[in-house]
Amino acid sequence: SSEQNQDDHATSNKERTGVKSNFEQTLRSINELLHASGSPEITFEESESGFVIRLPANLLFAKDSAKLQNDDALLFLKRIAMVIAKLPPDVVANVIGHTDSEQPASTEFKDNWQLSSARAISVVSELIKDGVDPKKLTASAKAEFEPFATNFTEQGREKNRRVEIHFVSLNLDDKAKTQKSILDAQE
């Protein structure tokens, strides 16, 4: 039955390649839309265990807020939800909120832990509202403790204020295969 295993492996590679190109297609169209409007670009990249979508906080939220603020953000999350629905069953999404090193000025959040976790939860709630199975999602927060850029300039702080969606396979044996198929899809 090694032929069956090869068939299954080929099918799962085709599925993953389709998932990757679906993501890339969605991101290309969103990036074009955002680029035309002058908004900062959403990034999509490989990670050690799968892939990551990085969303600038100012696309999603007003300063020091965790309330999703605009139609572009809601539309993008709706598209992400449609893509998540097509992922293999063992792939989950961890939504992580990040902030810069400055403490929130609003009284709603006493610190960056509260702000970054509230932002991650807002994104997860929206994805669930858009039809994603809650079992495929987690929300977590890093506050200011995983900066993407320097916190010494406004430009750097802006890059640090973000929400990341990490897609990983729960099947440990598949992690290397998932990453390989993601890399293969880029060629």
Q: Where in the sequence are the language-model features?
A:
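Terminal low-complexity, intrinsically disordered regions
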Residues: 1-2, 185-187
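Stable alpha-helical elements in mature extracytoplasmic
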Residues: 19-22, 26, 30, 73-76, ...
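Short secondary-structure junctions
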Residues: 33-40, 87-88
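Periplasmic OmpA-like peptidoglycan-binding domain that tethers envelope proteins to the cell wall
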Residues: 63-76, 85-86, 98-186
